[in-house]
Amino acid sequence: MTLTVYNTLTRRKEPLETLETGKIRMYCCGITVYDYCHLGHARTCMVWDVVRRYLQWRGYEVQYIQNFTDIDDKILNRARQEGTTMEAVSDRFIEAYFEDMEHLHVQKADAYPRATHTLNGIKRLVSELEAKGYAYQSNGDVYYSVRHFKDYGKLSGRKLEDLQAGASGRVEVQDPEAAKKKDPFDFAVWKAAKPGEPSWDSPWGQGRPGWHIECSAMVRERLGETIDIHVGGSDLIFPHHENEIAQSEAATGKPLARYWLHNGMVKVEGEKMSKSLGNFITIRDLLDKVDPMAMRLFILQAHYRKPVDFTDEALEAATNGWHTLKEGLLFGYNHGKQLNFTASPPHPLTSSPLTQRFQQAVDDDFNFAGGLAILFEIAKELRKEGNILVHQGQTETSPQVLEEQWRTLVELAGVLGLETDISEVQEAVGNGLSDAEIEELIEQRKIARQNKNYAEGDRLRDELKNQGIILVDQPGGITTWHRS
């Protein structure tokens, strides 16, 4: 099966062909660290986390880099408001970012370069652009000359004559930089120092880098001049990613990335999420109310390129979906001993028809919703067989087939970054009793009943029931159990 991806650059699906066989260099534009991460950040981070996991599962060696923008006006404004430093603000929200991502099961990138740690590379890149005629100085600032790059607009499909004044895409009524620029489309790659702001020495005097040049330098420094996949939110296509291409390709004469992938935005009840509308939701506020795995399901049930609408109904559906998957994930732990499951799979799960169907779905431009449908199919089948086993003492499907289905479910859930650790799943179900603790209480109940202490037997049965454990007394004095 061939893995195809939708390339924003070419506006079509293409087979994934890497620069180096079996290896992928992948870069994600990260957050500007001036506040807590919100729902939109959650989608971006989880989408590319699952893409990375899937590529690794498909056998690729993935080098994944995600940056932190720690030089920015928003960070400086926050520092002024709090009477602290830009570094202190950045450090605090980087730490908060890692806490949020741990809760969401987002794996750490291989490296998290920061703009402040890449200044030498940034200055080298600006110097190269200046030497090649793509950048010019103006009163301590250095601007990129957009019209000199003939392919400008190739990613976004925009033409200069159709754009509004200013490379940000906004009309500035009184642009303070307008007098410094040779052309209103030009954008800053180095900004002259301002009083009270952090600055660094450079060939153009004290100053700090512009936003777009930071990512160009970090990609080059960490992954090389051309990478396999560049990803980010669709809101970054223009101007940020367009400007990255202009800078990097002007400097090197080589493509910055083979494939450009972008995830869609998040709306809340049909409206764009914003602080002014009062519908701005941080990850940590959301996780006070919602299971992080339900959050992951909500994100994965929509195609990554499409916008997603965050509603109470959608979240409830995702929560119910996670309950269904949890029942399937617990099947082997609840019934595996009774069904004589083996210690390890009898053959590689990649040969399983269910696994092949999952791969066929996801190979089509990371159609995780299609892959999830396979997981739900397995989980519902296991739930049905578990109920039959509890009430009839045997299953309709052979134990060997059920074991393969269960192990396939566990593996594929892991590929999607869902919780598969039994202790965590059990806790999420609502009880913390281990199998051994349950068996011990069942044994105590058995002894009490043998001694005709039925009141104690009923008490133990009720205690287990209150913790989500249902006992079923079978003929011959055998007691089986399952989690509610």
Curated annotation (Swiss-Prot):
UniProt main location, coarse: cytoplasm
Entry keyword set: Aminoacyl-tRNA synthetase, ATP-binding, Cytoplasm, Ligase, Metal-binding, Nucleotide-binding, Protein biosynthesis, Zinc
| UniProt cofactor note | Binds 1 zinc ion per subunit.
Q: Where is this motif: 'KMSKS' region?
A: 272-276
Q: Does the keyword Aminoacyl-tRNA synthetase apply?
A: yes
Q: Which residues bind ATP?
A: K275
Reactions it catalyzes: tRNA(Cys) + L-cysteine + ATP = L-cysteinyl-tRNA(Cys) + AMP + diphosphate
Q: Which GO terms describe its molecular function?
A: ATP binding; cysteine-tRNA ligase activity; zinc ion binding
Q: What is its EC number?
A: 6.1.1.16
**One Pfam annotation, family name?**
CysS_C
Provide the residue positions that the database annotates as binding Zn(2+).
C29, C215, H240, E244
One GO cellular-component annotation of the UniProt record comes to: cytosol
Motif 'HIGH' region per record, residues: 31-41
Subunit text? Monomer.
The cross-references to PANTHER family, in alphabetical order and at most eight, read: CYSTEINE--TRNA LIGASE, CYTOPLASMIC, CYSTEINYL-TRNA SYNTHETASE
**Which protein family is it in?**
Belongs to the class-I aminoacyl-tRNA synthetase family.
Designated name of the protein: Cysteine--tRNA ligase
* Taxonomic source organism: Rippkaea orientalis (strain PCC 8801 / RF-1)
